[in-house]
Design a protein with these regions (language model features):
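Phosphate-coordination loops involved in phosphoryl transfer and adenosine-cofactor binding
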Residues: 37-43, 146-148, 172, 264
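Short, structured coil segments at secondary-structure junctions
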Residues: 65, 94, 114-116, 171, ...
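Phosphate/diphosphate ligand-binding glycine-rich loop within oxidoreductases
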Residues: 36-140, 275
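Positively charged, low-complexity intrinsically disordered leader regions
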Residues: 2-56
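Adenosine-phosphate binding glycine-rich loop
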Residues: 264-312
Length: 312
């Protein structure tokens, strides 16, 4: 018996990830079949970052499988006070599975190294695996397979890293990355070079104009964007100058009607959206159902992840 955690996709084979996606599809189609699948199981959710989708999807997800959840904010916990390893080990004595949405990747790694129950990374500075499983589920539903062309335009961040990791691992479809902005993550050149070597990640010139990028967009199935400013900084006065500099640099890369004109692609965004910044209101209006399908699929993907980890 080897207990699995999901910090990112490193510990999973392509077949295992496909099994999770197929299970998620079945759970979505036949919820009654799984209504007691995790009876009596206890999920602990810990939030250092703000959340709408991660909180709702995990808590409704475990409930739909017959389990219960216990939610705590990082600032209200004693993780902020003392030696964290003993706190982690204590939590594990009370619950069956843990999901934490944390600011730093190193804190997620600390959990991964010390838990005695399965642990899920609900998002950190470097990876967002559950979001990408929801994206993959949505791709399968809308296109029938993972063999799609996806163009990501925006910051090289946790969502982008996990997208690249997923496409490279699955060896299906291709992600084209236009990332003029690089956020602070642990994924260095080796990570991206290895992904490029699979042929399933194409790094576009980050100085490319949107006119040039538009030529690529015409052939895409999906155009994907994400916030340019991390959500914990968006309304932070101390971050005001850096935010303004970032927005000024990135405004030419907005996903708007002019850019999407002539492309058959649907638009993905992992939410929350900042209309008028990374995406225009018109593009949101046209693609809102796709974006909401993507967001709803967080719940189904995470149900499959929890079930898989608890039965690994």
């Amino acid at each position: 018996f080897v207990m699995k955690n999901m910090l990112n996709f490193k510990n999973f084979t392509a077949d295992e990830l496909m099994d999770i996606l197929n299970l998620a599809l079945d759970m979505k189609k036949n919820p009654e079949k799984y209504a007691h699948a995790l009876d009596g199981k206890k999920l602990y959710t810990l939030f250092e970052k703000t959340s709408t989708r991660t909180f709702l999807s995990f808590t409704t997800g475990i409930t739909e499988l017959g389990g219960t959840y216990y939610n705590q904010l990082w600032k209200d916990s004693n993780f902020t006070l003392g030696e964290p390893v003993s706190e982690i080990k204590y939590v594990c004595r009370n619950v069956d599975i843990i999901m934490a949405r944390l600011v730093k990747n190193e804190t997620v790694e600390l959990f991964g190294d010390n838990v005695t129950v399965p642990f899920i990374n609900g998002c950190d500075s470097s990876y967002h695996p559950c979001q990408i499983l929801a994206d993959a589920l949505t791709i399968i539903e809308k296109f029938g397979s993972l063999d799609v062309k996806l163009m990501y335009i925006g910051a090289k961040n946790n969502v982008f890293n996990s997208l690249v990791e997923f496409f490279a691992k699955m060896k299906r479809g291709t992600i084209y990355g236009l990332t003029p902005l690089v956020n602070n993550t642990v994924c260095g050149d080796d990570f991206f070079e290895a992904a490029k070597a699979t042929g399933h990640y194409v790094e576009l010139d980050p100085t490319m104009s949107m006119e040039e990028a538009k030529k690529y967009a015409k052939d895409m199935d999906i155009l994907y964007t994400d916030t340019w400013v991390d959500m914990e900084f968006f309304n932070n006065p101390a971050y005001k100058q850096q935010k303004e500099e970032t927005l000024a640099k990135m405004m030419p890369y907005q996903l708007n009607e002019e850019f999407t004109e002539g492309s058959k692609a649907i638009v993905f965004h992992d939410m929350p959206m900042h209309q008028g910044f990374e995406i225009s209101q018109g593009v949101i209006d046209k693609n809102l159902n796709h974006i909401l399908d993507e967001a709803e699929n967080r719940r189904h993907a995470e149900k499959a992840v929890m079930y898989t980890l608890l039965n690994s």
